Amino acid sequence: MALVAYYIRTETEGILPTKDEQMAAVLAYAAEKGHDLVAHYEDIDAPGLLLYHRPGLKEAINNIKELEDWEVLVVAEPRCISDTESALHEFVHKLSLYGNRLESPARPWEDFLADMRSYRRAMSRR
């Protein structure tokens, strides 16, 4: 059983699932995996491009650097982290550096990690 936090982001355009839909997906996923929920972070009506302009996500990042209260951050969908692949890969890289991971009902950690590594290899060839 892993100690987990969950993150919810909504935005004003209505592209992402609602807060209630995200919470239901995250809680169902955590229960299915046997995870122990210990924290949550939210950014309501937050744009999806810049990671560091969101207080909830900044708090989660601070936790992985300083407090180490949890091992896994669960999101309903990968785009709840960011609308851009590069920002998502940056976040996955940061989690991997600190021994944490990102999980979603739509995508396991191994896929996030493999995609991030492929992206970083492609960027290093430029």
Predicted regions and their residues:
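Short, structured surface patches at the beginning of a domain
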Residues: 1-126
